[in-house]
Structure formats: C-alpha cells, structure tokens
Amino acid sequence: MSIKIHHGPNGSYKTSGAIQDDAVPALKDGRVIITNVRGFTLERAYQVFPDLPNTAEIINLDLESLEDLEKMRTWFQWAPRGAFLIFDETQLLFPKSWREKDLERFDYPGGPEAAHAADRPMGWLDAWTRHRHFNWDIVLTTPNISYIRDDIRMTCEMAYKHSNLAVIGIPGRYKEAQHDAQLNRPPADGTIIEYKRIRKQTFALYQSTATGKTQDTKAGKSLFRSPKLVLLLALLAGTIGFVWYMGPLRTIGGPAAATPADAPGDPAQAPAAPAAVAAPARPAANSFLPPGLVPDGPAAAPVDLNAHPFADRRISILAHAYRKSRGDIYMFALEDPTGRHLELTSWQLIGSGYRVTPKGECVVELRYEDWKQTVTCAGRQAGAVASIAPAAPVAASADAPARGQSPLTIVPDSEYASRPWRQK
C-alpha cells in the first residue's frame, strides 16, 4: 500500500507508464480502480484482457464534471477498502493554494465518532497519512512535482521522473528515474534509472488526448547530429574493421622461415662410404648453437611455431645480473632466420607469459605452457679461429680422420720471444 508520483513534461509517458506499471497489475488482481484517466473503462479493459477476474471494476470520473471533481476530492469518504486510485493531472484535483481552513470541509460529517463508526478517515490529513490502514494504493501524475501539495508529498513513498527519449532521436521510449518524493529532481548519484517502452495494448486501454489523435514530441534534436558522437562512432567502427582485416597478432617479428626440404636422391646409387663430407643442415630456428658449430647428422625436425610466441627465433643469454631485492636478471638475444636481432629482459619474457627458472649465470630454463627449453650463453668465436676457418666445407681427403673422431684445430703460436730463464 503506497503513494507514488509520476512526473515529467507533457508527452513523457507519465499516464501510460502509470497504467502499464501500476493499474494493469491491479486490474489483473481483480481490484476496484478509481481513476479520472480519459477513456480508461472496464469495457476497454475486457477488450484488451478478456480473462480479467469478475471482481475487477473501474470507476471512471470526468475531470470536467463538477460532480465528479468533488467525488475525487472526497475520495476517502466513499472509496471501498482495497481500492486502487490513479489520479491524472493531480495539480487540478488538489490545488496547492488550499489553506488549512479550506481543508476543514473534508472532515467526516458527524465528527471523529461518526467516522470511526463508518470505518472512514476523520479528515484530509488522516486519509493521506493512514491510507495503508484502508488498503488503498494511490498513484498521482503531474507535469511538475512541485505542483503537488506538501502534505501529500510527505506521505509519498517514491517519485518517478519521466523523460521522453524522442528529444534525442529515440522515439517510442522513455527514461524513468526513481527518487525521493521530497526532492524535485533525481540526485546525480545513487539514482535508479530504467529505460522503458509502452506496449501497444497499454495505449488501447485509454485515450491520451481529447481528440483521440496522438503524436510524439517534436522538441529536441537527434543524438546523431552531434559531430563528436559521429566522430567517436566512426573511429570505433574503423578500429573494429582494421582489427578484423589484419587478423589476430600471434608473434612479434617477421614471418617464420620455412624448413628446407631434404634434397631428393636415389638411395640405391648412394655409395657405402661417403666420398665427401655433406654440407651441414641448417640448424633449427630455436637452436641455441651459434652458426658454424652444427653437428653432423640429418636435418633437425621442423619447428612448432605455435609452441610459444618466439618459436621462430634462436634464444641465447647476453648478460646476467643479480640483485638481492629482485634476484637473477637476464638479458636475452632473440635472432630470427633472416638475421634480425631482438633483445629482451627476463622481466619482459615473464610479462609475455614465460616462466624463467635460473640455473646459473649462463643457464636458464624457459617454460611456456607445455613448451620447455634450456637456454645458455651463446659466447663468441676467437679471432684466430675465425681467421682460419674455411668459408666452405672442404672435401675429405683419403687420409682424413675417420668419421666420429674429434677434429684437430691448429692455432699458431703468437707468444713473444722466449724468456732467457726458460729452459729449452
């Protein structure tokens, strides 16, 4: 049992919202409805809702009839218990200009004892403050809540401010903001806002204008006439289209190099012992051996480029540092098959989803989901070794060491002249 106020400018769906949200549920419960909403009759209600309970009743009063106007103003002297009252244009029914003396005429005839015997409120204030004792629900509509008398507003439970969204180019919908009935407008914070739409069957229950013709508001401008909003929507659409066209970004760097296929050959014509040392196969892209130190044997298996984000790059340790507050810190070098070089710290790899487990200054274990690899320092070749290293594989001679023996590298003696005390 409550008193509610629906307020807002003309054409903001106050009356239709009150009927749809409040009167229709009461009608389906079989309650008696007392109202001055034009055209809201029981005949129309049965046309829209044929299965209404037999106890449902609508008492429609005409605001332009002096007799009906007086009945609405003295509703608490004759309304049955449990009735649902919905008063449209409340500012005309209960003017704010009434003073205390004007309200004395609403005292029940015969005084408080007669009112008690008739089970009626004693007067004006008693009716509005003790409406729950008589199971009355009251809904009021007005263009401006400040038109409602203070003694009525102080008994109201909630107020609902209506705004027609057609003023920003969204026809057929309205915004309803719930707030305290003592306030003239909803506060900026903590307001419950709903966006609603009136159903067609609700409009069939009543007549919103005296002529029967209705049209939406012509005030306001479309929301899409704002250049800022149009620019924002265009930027958003362009971003989504660009991402869709480019596809998801999986790895950082260039495309993965294709694994060279084995050269075709006839195994029947192959000699029992090779006459020359075959050219070493290209190391796998994630190999940690520097170029030139390639083991003999068949080519490595193709690299799974989906194992981790940097699967197409060779990873090695460039530097190591230790801080007591942060532990081991590594600098990694990542090189792809085309020679492009990338340097990342262990923190950056951890941020990319890797797990870095230090095993020493030059040994680290990297993990990424199911992938695991041990990374070491790459080091660098000595200048002397590099100077005499052949540019291309040399054919094996007849007296070459057997396959599997360790190769012997001769380094020229660059030591200065023998010391005089050195014994020969």
Curated annotation (Swiss-Prot):
Keywords recorded for this protein, A-Z: Host membrane, Membrane, Transmembrane, Transmembrane helix
Membrane spanning stretches: 229-249
Region feature Disordered, mapped onto this chain: 396-424
Highest taxon of the lineage: Viruses
Membrane topology: Single-pass membrane protein
Keyword Nucleus attached: no
Cellular component GO terms held in the UniProt record: host cell membrane; membrane
Main location: host cell
Compartments, as annotated in UniProt: Host membrane
Function: May play a role in phage assembly.
Name listed for the protein in its UniProt record: Uncharacterized protein ORF424
Organism: Pseudomonas phage Pf1
